[in-house]
Amino acid sequence: MPKIEGQIMELTTETIRFIEENARADVRSLALQAKKYPQVDMAMAVVQIAGRQIAEAKVPTWYHTEGLLYPKHLSMEQCSSEATAIYKASLVEGDTFADLTGGFGIDCSFMSRKFRQADYVERQAELCELAKHNFPLLGLDIDVHHEDGVEYLKQMNPVDVLFLDPARRDGHGGKTVAISDCEPDVSALEDLLVEKAQKVLVKLSPMLDLSLALKDLKHVCEVHIVSTDNECKELLLILQKMPVQSEISIHCINSLGATNGYRIYQEYTFTQEQERTSDCPLTHEVEAYLYEPNASILKAGAYRSLTQAYPVKKLHPSSHLYVSPHYIEDFPGRKFQVEAVSGFGKKDLKTFLQGMEKANLTIRNFPSSVADLRKRLKLKEGGEDYLFATTLADESKVLIKCKKASSLL
């Protein structure tokens, strides 16, 4: 059995049975019942049950692998999902690979399959022991090193690909906007990183200021902004020593789940030069279809170039909503059919909202919060109607009623 923080982790038959029988139970409730089950290591059981519950949705491949052990709650919450790990694996290949910030090992487990030799480096002893236990069960032959990633980097032999997932070091969970707020500090290590690997893949928080990151780092050749079901999850930077093209390609990815075992992605790629130089047609006419770019595109700031890639017009420079007279099936974001448009006069709203008790409300460039506007409109959350409160190119404020376009076709 692996050693965890100096103690032998022994899962007795009773504890294993308890974990299996309580797979769906509320772990907070179970933790209070330890005295009722003296033969069960309740502390360990609760950790394993909670880990499995998170893994079922987040990392199904791991969930369906028997015998895996899970770490404490924080490590599970912070680890990558299977969808984002699979995407990262699609960006790398070669002979040798090293993960300098191993963590729970999910990213390493998916990327390592693309290499002959893989090394996992982690300074927390517990996570190293879990990796030693779990990797063989996943059919992986990965060398585990209980060591600080920066120290390992200094003495390691060069590899084809290096991976880092710097952690926030603000100590209180506050908003992080700069690479220097993370540990290890990639900006301080950049020259050494590109000396040690042909390609360096860096995973950063989506809260990071992308423009600032590109100013801080001189070897970035690609940016990948990854969302899952329209929630921005990761900012990935690919660094290479030579050559670095003058224009960095920015890839906006939105994972929409899997069909028949194949993962479905929305993808939109552009450069900052394309964004700067693109004409952006504006309109104050709300046409038949309305589009909201996915979270990755909004994070990337690809507002103008979208109008060149797709036959759409923007409702306002700051609204980030687009319209077209005809349906554009492959637009990378949410797509709606417009049913009605209203101003905010009392009579207009009364007619517009007649018979409507609930709706999904979104604010875009509008002087109110969702909560305040929902209260004003006296609408509950949910239903099949979608309302967008926004500002048009002529500065008029409107409420746009829509239905999801995909459900109508």
Model-derived features with residue positions:
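SAM-dependent transferase fold signal centered on methyltransferase-like domains
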Residues: 1-409
